[in-house]
Swiss-Prot record:
UniProt GO BP: tRNA N1-guanine methylation
GO cellular component: cytosol
Family according to the record: Belongs to the RNA methyltransferase TrmD family.
Subunit details: Homodimer.
Protein name (database record): tRNA (guanine-N(1)-)-methyltransferase
Length: 248
């Protein structure tokens, strides 16, 4: 997968290219990331990239010409098929379903805003989609872009050691993930659930599914509203509710 990023702070993306899962993906050639800095497209000695907004008000906007030229350079490198995404709190909220949609693309260009944002006409003429990682304000689009890159890259074939790792992640099937345990068997008086030590793979599968359903019900019940549960899931969830009521 090819990813282009338009950003005033390309150094921040070393966190993506040099570390962790995404860093290994880059080293394996499964993920390619290039950056374009609007400062490199300025025409004055001060490399100015901000400008005053029409109508006044606090703050500045990203200057149109350097930003637009940087986007055009990224498009030229990516080819016609690349989708241009602007990271914005006004965009569609990023969910696992959205991540799966974006992961089907061969190439993406991510535009990271700064200051008070960008000229609306840039969005109208250069951007295909706006995406948000949540209802809160950040200083720029770089952290949302890195979040999107990390989540999308996990679905690129070969990036994770086992595809099952991605399939078991929270939200991959619309549910939160189940609890996980490793050694020791007892920690501060808390034991690993016996079923996980049983070696019975079917029992373990059902326990994990039930825990996933129950955790979703307790912590993010709205997620269940959008799911058509199977007969097995409905039964397991009912059993979870019954056991929770008995305990408490």
């Amino acid at each position: 997968m090819w990813l282009g990023v338009v950003t005033l702070f390309p150094e921040m993306f070393r966190a993506v290219t040099d570390f962790g899962v995404t860093g290994r993906a880059v080293n394996k050639g499964l993920l390619e990331l290039q950056t374009w800095n609007p400062r490199d497209f300025t025409h004055d000695k001060h490399k100015t990239v901000d400008d005053r907004p029409y109508g006044g008000g606090p703050g500045m906007l990203m200057m149109v010409q350097p930003l637009r030229d940087a986007i055009h350079a990224a498009k030229a490198a990516a080819g016609d098929s690349a989708k241009v995404i602007y990271l914005s709190p006004q965009g569609r909220k990023l969910t696992q379903q959205g991540v799966e949609e974006l992961a089907k693309s061969d190439s993406l260009i991510l535009v990271c805003g700064r200051y008070e944002g960008v000229d609306e006409r840039i969005i109208q003429t250069e951007v295909d989609e706006e995406w948000s990682i949540g209802d809160y304000v950040l200083s720029g689009g770089e952290l949302p872009a890195m979040t999107l890159i990390d989540s999308v890259s996990r679905l690129v074939p070969g990036v994770l050691g086992k595809q099952a790792s991605a399939e078991q992640d929270s939200f991959s099937d619309g549910l939160l993930d189940c609890p996980h345990y490793t050694r020791p068997e007892t920690l501060d008086g808390l034991d690993v659930p016996a079923v996980l030590l049983s070696g019975n793979h079917e029992h373990i599968r059902r326990w994990r599914l039930q825990q996933s359903l129950g955790r979703t019900l307790l912590r993010r019940p709205e997620l269940l509203e959008n799911l058509a549960l199977t007969d097995e899931q409905t039964k397991l969830l009912a059993q979870f509710v019954d056991s929770t009521n008995e305990c408490g």
